[in-house]
């Protein structure tokens, strides 16, 4: 498991009965987590002293309760700064476990010693975008939701990176990649965080298990002749890390060589000393002589 254990402004305090108790800066949140299938005692007093709790509804969805929070606040991870905003469907705009990938990206880009062009697909609020930009890469950030792209710009500004070479694209990721192929554009590093399920603007249905292989096949066509890394993230429970590795070996490593690793992402739980699993990642890297 790749553990995101370098946070100072965020921590999972405890987990029990389908929920996790978290500290985001100075605020305590309780949010649902489908991985938490254990019913351990909620001995930590902060379970009863939270600033906000997201409660699921029996009819679907849910809402924030006891919301004693500002509309937004900031948390830092190393040199990166993020705007935290409690949203519908429990989210805050940051996936803290991805810090394990941010560290990998920043280290790999800095070690490369050359200009690196990064394509970040399904880029959300831009955690990977600002990590790569902070390391000196130029980044193309693509997400179909305009609000998420605007939020990513806020994070970039908060991190003091607004002058870095970042191209902001609001578009369907597959359509954008198809256009880049026609233009002859290439990238040295590709990151993707595709959803488990979604619908496009014209009613197209996206199911990760059905669409991931052809999508990765498409995206691999914009890799440069000297690629640095290729990363796939997944929060789909049924998609094992080894499946993503097999796919990446077939579509990327077969052409470029290099090495592929896949594993779960996780966050340390303070009160138990255990690790909470938080999705999976596959990383391909081109080993340089």
Named regions from a protein language model:
Residues 7-22, 29-96, 103:
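Non-catalytic substrate-recognition/targeting regions of SAM-dependent transferases
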Residues 96-114:
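Conserved alpha-helix/loop element of class I SAM-dependent methyltransferases that forms part
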Residues 114-124:
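Conserved class I S-adenosyl-L-methionine
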Residues 123, 143-147, 211:
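Short beta->alpha hinge that forms the Motif I/post-I loop of the SAM-binding pocket
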Residues 125-139:
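Conserved SAM-binding loop of SAM-dependent methyltransferases across substrates and taxa
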Residues 145-191:
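S-adenosyl-L-methionine
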Residues 173-253:
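S-adenosylmethionine
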Residues 227-289:
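C-terminal catalytic and target-recognition region of SAM-dependent MTase-like enzymes
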